[in-house]
Amino acid sequence: MNRFRKMVTVVTALFAMQAAMAQDDVQITFDKLPAKAQSFVKTHFPKEEVASVWKDIEIEMLRVEDYTVALSNGTKVEFLPNGEWKEIKSRGSEIPASIIPSGIRDYVKKHYASSTIKDIKKKRYGYEVELTGDIDLEFNSKGKFLRVDD
């Protein structure tokens, strides 16, 4: 009987631990973001209020994968664990020009003057940019145009 109780206790503990670890998105406060990410938000979105901040934890590795900051205007900014931004998604408002590399800004202004950048994502090769009108463009790390992504 004693052995049965131990087995039940162990199984119950394992289920409880698994349930606790299954939550991989944890809401945190703004001050828990890496300092570099806090500075980025304050610099480029000074008039926007922070609606929520989330930390995404990789369950298997027990490490932080990224942070997501949702702003009052609907914009979401994803950061790497070191505080570098990796993606910015705008919902109705324009992404601040101060964030976008000048080569990308100039190319979009010249070739897609009536469009605005609604998403920008850092990739290994450079940047992926989505314009209003669902046009996807790719640029190298220096902001030089590579191709239209179909």
Per-region residue spans from a language model:
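Bacterial Sec-dependent N-terminal signal peptides
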Residues: 1-25, 41
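Interaction-mediating elements
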Residues: 23-150
